[in-house]
A protein has these predicted regions:
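Membrane-interfacial, low-structure loops and terminal tails that flank and connect transmembrane helices
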Residues: 1, 167-171, 212-222
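Start-transfer (signal-anchor) and selected internal transmembrane alpha helices
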Residues: 1-23, 218-227, 231
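Membrane-water interface of alpha-helical transmembrane segments
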Residues: 3-10, 82, 92, 96-99, ...
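Hydrophobic alpha-helical transmembrane segments of integral membrane proteins
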Residues: 5, 9-10, 19-20, 76, ...
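Membrane-embedded helix bundles of polyisoprenyl
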Residues: 13-14, 107-117, 121-211, 226-245
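Hydrophobic residues in alpha-helical segments
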Residues: 25, 50-52, 163-168, 211-215
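Conserved, charged catalytic cores of large soluble enzymes
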Residues: 205, 210-214, 243-262
């Protein structure tokens, strides 16, 4: 319990994010590098405009001859974090709130992960700065779905660590449920591959964290049960996005084409 408590030192990542995003707030500008400017912002703006008109953004008539907008996972219209676009602010302001909120979430979740592994408070804050504001994550402002998944990744890893611990049925249920919810948020945020990578990480973490005495570790059968339960919860919560995307993908050119696109 002590390790999960917040520290005043977390003001440091908050102030760092404020220093980065502050000038954008003052000038009313958005970073439009690469995919953000020509894909994500127009897509999110279209969704924002339809919601403001009281129309569910299920179909887009702006691409090709029309396409199922809700089936495009990168649109992430079912992601709960999109409630930030319902704030009584301009689209640009809502977009900045969305970006800065996920940067802050990445820092907080990294802090929690580091503390769970026994890192000191100052070390956990340093870890949160290194990950949340490091180049690999910070540059994802131009590829927003990956920023969203990166913000939830540390929490997912910490929950994987928890389900690997021997515990009673009551104690083991919570992290399994929380992991399922977190995986669903990653999928709904637009990056289903990250959720798959987290699941693939579970047996690896189990292997590297196995105790010297096998009897004190969690049995493989119980680990399989917990992993399966978490995946089922994630699928149930993210099915509203997964099923339309899967159905739409069946009519895509990659599905229809019989040969590989590459020369290999």
């Amino acid at each position: 319990m002590e390790r999960s408590k917040l520290s005043p030192l977390l003001l440091i990542p908050f102030l760092a994010i404020l220093a980065i995003a502050g000038p954008l707030w003052v000038s009313g500008e958005l970073p439009v590098f690469r995919d953000a400017g020509h894909f994500y912002y127009p897509s999110f703006h279209y969704e924002h405009a339809l919601w403001n008109q009281g129309i569910a953004p299920l179909w887009s008539s702006l691409d090709d001859l029309g396409r199922p907008f809700a089936a495009d996972s990168s649109a992430s219209i079912f992601y709960p974090g999109k409630f930030l676009f319902w704030l009584p602010l301009s689209f640009a302001s809502c977009m900045l709130v969305y970006l800065t909120a996920h940067l802050l979430l990445a820092c907080l979740n990294t802090y929690y992960l580091a503390r769970q592994f026994g890192v000191s408070t100052s070390g956990a804050v340093l870890a949160s700065l290194s990950f949340g504001l490091g180049g690999a994550v910070l540059t994802q402002h131009s590829n927003i779905i990956y920023l969203v998944s990166a913000s939830w990744l540390p929490l997912a890893i910490s929950l994987v660590h928890r389900i690997l611990q021997p515990s009673t049925k009551t104690d083991s249920a919570r992290p399994v449920i929380y992991l399922g919810v977190t995986l669903a948020l990653i999928v709904l945020g637009g990056d289903a591959q990250m959720a798959l990578h987290v699941v693939l990480l579970i047996p690896l973490m189990h292997w590297f964290n196995r105790p010297k005495e096998k009897k004190s570790g969690i049995p493989y059968r119980k680990l399989t049960q917990r992993t399966t339960a978490a995946c089922l919860i994630a699928f149930a919560l993210a099915a509203i996005q997964v099923l339309p995307t899967y159905e739409w993908a069946q009519s895509g050119s990659r599905k229809i084409r019989s040969s590989s696109r590459t020369t290999y």
